[in-house]
Structures are given as structure tokens and as C-alpha cells.
Amino acid sequence: MNRSIVRFLIAKLLLIEAALLVVPLIVALIYHEDAKVFASILGTMGILLFLGVLGTLFKPKNYHIYTKEGMLIVALCWVLWSFFGGLPFVFAGQIPSVIDAFFEMSSGFTTTGATILTDTGVLTHSLLFWRSFAHLIGGMGVLVFALAIMNNSKNGHHEVMRAEVPGPVFGKVVAKLKNTAQILYIIYLTMFVIFAVILWLCGMSIFDSIITAMGGAGTGGFAVYNDSIAHYHSDLITYVVTVGTLLFGVNFNLYFYILLRKIKFFFQDEELRTYFAIVAISTGLIILNIFGIYHNLADSFKYSFFEVSTIITTTGFGLTDITKWPLFSQYILLLLMFIGGSAGSTAGGFKVIRAMIIAKIARNQTLASLYPNRILSLHINGSVLDKETQHSVLKYLAVYVLIILSLVTVLSLDNQDLLIVTSAAASTFNNIGPLLGTSDSFAIFSPLSKLIMGFAMIAGRLEIYPLLLLFLPKTWSKT
């Protein structure tokens, strides 16, 4: 274990978080907020600067990062950023509990959008902005963001980025990894700006459009108001948000093909076609199922398309009370919670590509039992998928199911009903946000459950393994 490089890079990342807090500080100045808010932000910046400078005083002799160090850096960074990112809420007295603040910012950085707040009105503009700003930074990945702006290009960035970017296969769009991070972030931020401008043109205030765009771009779903998108009573805004979140659930590497004018490669992608097919089929089924509630096709389509888009992308914006929908529609949405968006997107969940691979493995196993002598291979985008990747997906599925079941078991100790407990486990681990049931706030859970769900959100965002390393004694050994 190269502990010195872990300490050095974590310290650098804490300095970056301190710098990011300048943004909500500016928002506090714009809205003339009270001294307590300024003190809370500046106090947190001071703590981060102290720890960051202390950790970078002694440079490591060996800059090489191996797989274990890469995964450990990623896990520690997300936990520490969530903890320190929550301190302004605690110091300002707007979320007095440290555990609640950790939960809220874990939800922010992991782009989950789950909240312990029953009323967003308790937050000042600056801290409301800070928790949504976490969506924007966490959407493409905290470490991808850091890699895009850091000058250091030593060995090992591949291990760090591979540990953070979701999906079974990690690929670079260009030869240099730093350039890959920069290209992805330029595409991401450009789409975010376009999204925010369109929302503003649709009638939102500048502040609301930025907050909503950050929630949509990061597929997190934090909103300005308690009733989320329903607050605006605008079909135009509803459809802009629906399509916008759907586009952020697409693999960002595919957008690079568009920049290269390789449109054919974009539309030939098998995961993309499956992703849109799932959206279309799910929307159609729900329209048929809820038509009796709304009694017209326009409203049935609007609500169905919006909820399918916001759930499969794991955004979690709200428009209507889906608990009043028939059980069949709720079941479809629960299934979409588990599937999630595309690999390489800002969306969470199991990922469409993994679901495709599992389905194809199941098909091949069925065919093998019928035709024992037939040689079967698994193809994705016209290429044979190697056995190692297939096995890694199956192993991930096993761990994924085990963690979901464990979460449901632990959360059931709070004596909530089964639908709430199951959706809480699925919602936090898949980084979705909303609860299915009688409550849409996680304040109903005990502090221990909220702490566990905070770590579950990070585990889900990092796809389990990096966070698990933190709790293995062997991780901290010198060998």
C-alpha cells in the first residue's frame, strides 16, 4: 500500500472542495444572507484548507497508483467530501444533525436526490445551491472532475478513473486520460448550460433554472421547491425536463462521436437502442394502465413519460403522486429503479448494459441446454464479449442482490412498511432519490439507518467495490 500517495491526493482533493465552497459563498453575497451562513461556509473552508495544506506538506517519493490505491482514494474522497460538505448545514443550524447533513450531501454528490428535509424552505439560497451544486460535480464523478483540472499527470490516473466511472467496461475517448476527462466535462457542462438556458427561456427564474439544470444534468433531482417540477404548472417545462434528463442518461462517450460527426456510431450503439426501447415500452404500458385516472391521452402521456424518464435516469424529480397509480405502473417504475441508465452516463442503477449482458447470458444458457454441441458466443455492438467481463457482471449481480437484501433487512428494524423499506433500499443504493409509499422524506428513518443509507448511496455510486475496501483490514496493510 502506497499510503503517502493516498494521503497526498486526498489532501489535494480536500483543497479542491474548499475552493468549490467559494461558489455558495458568492450566492450568499448575492442574496445578502446573514453572518451565520457566511461563518458556516468560511469555517468549513478553513477546516478543509488546514487539512489539505497539512496533507500536502510532504510529497510522496513514489507517485505510482496501483488498483488498490486507486479504489481507496476514490472511496475516501467520496466519504470525506460528503462529511465535510455537510458541515455548512450543521454550522448554520439549518440541518443540525451531523448524520442528517452527511446523508444530505452523500445524496448530493452521489446524485441520489434523497432528502431528510420535509421543507426545503429551511435552507437559505446559498446552501440550497450548494447541495444542488454537489449534483453537478458528482454527476460525472468527483475524481473525473479533479483529474480534468489538476496539472499533475503522474502514473495511476487510469486506476482512479476506472474505480469511479460506472459500468462494466471503462474506455477512453482519446489516448491521454486527462484529455478524456476534460473532453467529457466540456460536453457535460455545455449540455448543462444549454439545459439551464432553455429552462430560463421557458419561464423559470435564473436561480430556479440553474438549480433544476444541476439536478437534471447530474440526474440527482434536488429541486428548489417541495413539490419539485409540479410547482411550475407548465407542460413546456415538464417536457424540457423529461427530455433533458433522458439525454443525461446516455453514455457520454457517444456524444463524443457526434462531435466527430460519426452519427452512425451513435445510433448503432446497442445499449442506447435498448435504453430508448425500455423507455418507449414502459411509457406505453403505463399510459394504458393509468388512462382511466386522467381520462385523456395528453395527460396520460405527459405523466407516464416524465416518471419513466426521471426514474430510469435515477433523477427523481417529482410531478405527481405515483402512489395513487395502479400497482402495475408502480411495479414498472420499481423495475426501472433497478435497471437505471446507461454506463458512462450520470445515471445510477444496475445499468442497461449489464441488464443486456445478463439477458444474453440467460438466453445462451437456455440454448446450450437445448443444443449441447452448439458453440455460443455473446455479442455486444457486433463484438464478442470476453468471458472475463461476463463473469465480472455475474459476480457484480450477486453482490448487488446481496447488498439490496441486506439493506432491506437492516432498514426493516425501523418498523416502516415493506414498500417504503424496499424502495428506500433500492432508491439509495441505485442513487434514485424518491420513496414509493406514504412518505417522500427520509426523515422517518432512525439516525443509524440514515448513516447506513448514506454509505449505501456512495457504495451504489462507486459500484460497491471501492467502498467495501475501506472495511477490509487487508486494505490498510503495507503490502
Predicted segments, located by residue:
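Membrane-proximal intracellular helices of multi-pass ion channels
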Residues: 1-479
